[in-house]
């Protein structure tokens, strides 16, 4: 089994709700790190064997295989295929795993993985309700098998998060301390330029908008839970955000001598 190597990892800054990327079409957003990849790496893009992007809520401007759409919008060769992965919040991570597995199995040598999402344009979980105009309240509506197993209890990320917290004895205070630390680390990394090599500016938009400089544990403690009686609040939940990333993964045979790992 061969090894897989990440030789380029680029991303846009992350835009907040109603922020700098809110009106950018997902295909144009996803094209940005793809274009820059080939500005920085000496590689013929026509040699790429697959483009695997993660994206949740693949409806509207994110439908129609957004991975390939981003590639084409970037002006890259139309002989290269693309596919889109939906593993919910782990979609882009799964795209990277699939790319690495393709290389490690020997079926591919050059693959791009990444992801794109504009949550301002396509709100979170919109795909879950998109079938309502066709008479489907949600993806599980009127499925006898689903109802036999789970009943009609609402399917919710917040319920799931609360179940995990209960199973592993994670308190609200534990989560808030972790969230506060996460914001502080992100802000420190921004202020010290640690993200500069990986971020591709979008016009004059240079830095992530999502880390909160003004948040405190005291402010977090004042928030009401999303679901009454539970402990999950907005402060410990992922934000609505927009962004894209592109990672170039190669087999050893395609890595030039100067960049070959020792």
Language model feature labels by segment:
Residues 10-12, 23-32, 40, 174-252:
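N-terminal extracellular/periplasmic Venus flytrap/periplasmic-binding protein-like
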Residues 253-262:
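Single conserved hydrophobic/aromatic residue that forms the stacking wall/gate
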Residues 55-109, 151-157, 214-239:
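Conserved catalytic cysteine-centered active-site region
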Residues 1-74, 81, 89, 163-172, ...:
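Conserved active-site "lid/cap" helical segment
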Residues 11-39, 57-60, 83-97, 120, ...:
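Active-site pocket-shaping loop/turn-to-helix segments
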Residues 87-117, 165-194, 247-252:
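Active-site-proximal alpha-helical scaffold in enzymes
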Residues 110-163:
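Flexible glycine-/small-residue-enriched beta->alpha junction loops
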């Amino acid at each position: 089994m061969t090894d897989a190597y990440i030789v380029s990892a680029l991303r846009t800054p992350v835009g907040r709700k109603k922020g700098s990327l809110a009106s950018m079409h997902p295909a144009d957003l996803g094209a940005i790190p793809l274009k820059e990849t080939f500005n920085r790496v000496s590689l013929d893009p026509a040699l790429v064997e697959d483009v695997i992007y993660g994206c949740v809520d693949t409806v509207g401007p994110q439908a129609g295989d957004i991975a390939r759409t981003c590639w084409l919008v970037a002006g890259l060769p139309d002989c290269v295929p693309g596919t889109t992965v939906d593993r919910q919040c782990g979609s882009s991570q799964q795209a990277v795993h699939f790319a690495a597995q393709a290389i490690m199995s020997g079926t591919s040598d050059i693959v791009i993985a990444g992801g794109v999402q504009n949550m301002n344009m396509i709100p979170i979980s919109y795909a879950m309700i998109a079938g309502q105009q066709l008479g489907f309240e949600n993806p599980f509506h009127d499925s006898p098998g689903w109802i036999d197993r789970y009943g009609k209890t609402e399917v919710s990320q917040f319920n799931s998060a609360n179940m995990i917290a209960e199973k592993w004895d994670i308190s609200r205070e534990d989560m808030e301390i972790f969230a506060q630390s996460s914001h502080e680390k992100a802000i420190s990394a921004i202020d010290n330029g640690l993200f500069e090599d990986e971020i591709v500016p979008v016009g004059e938009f240079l830095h992530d908008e999502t880390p909160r400089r003004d948040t405190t544990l005291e402010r977090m403690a004042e928030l009401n839970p999303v679901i009454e009686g539970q402990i999950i609040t907005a402060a410990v939940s992922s934000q609505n955000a927009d962004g894209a990333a592109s990672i170039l993964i190669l087999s050893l045979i395609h890595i030039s001598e100067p960049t070959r790992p020792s």
